[in-house]
């Protein structure tokens, strides 16, 4: 059974969404484990804030890169479908 572009695209979109959701869940678990701020020294509080910012930034960058890869794969899949179509039905 041949996969259509729409099926391929929808599957990549679902995978992107699922991965993003899992990353957000992992981040939420990590942030929930942070000690109560009232027990932290100013230096440790600053450390946690920087670390949280870094995690959020890296998560955003990673999700953006995953989306870019998915779009690239969709483009390549569309090109392969066109090549296959051209091979099956060559113009005269």
Swiss-Prot record:
UniProt keyword terms in alphabetical order: Cytoplasm, Cytoskeleton, Microtubule
Superkingdom of source: Eukaryota
GO terms of biological process kind: cytoskeleton organization; defense response; positive regulation of cell population proliferation
Cystine pairs: none
Keyword Cytoplasm belongs to the record: yes
InterPro entries: KMP11
Subcellular localization(s) per the UniProt record: Cytoplasm; Cytoplasm, Cytoskeleton
Record GO cellular component, one term: cytoplasm
Primary site of residence: cytoplasm
SUBUNIT field: Monomer.
Protein family per UniProt: Belongs to the KMP-11 family.
Protein function: May be involved in the regulation of the cytoskeleton through interaction with the subpellicular microtubules. May be involved in parasite mobility and attachment to the surface of the host cell. Behaves as a strong immunogen during infection.
Annotated protein name in UniProt: Kinetoplastid membrane protein 11
Organism field: Leishmania tropica
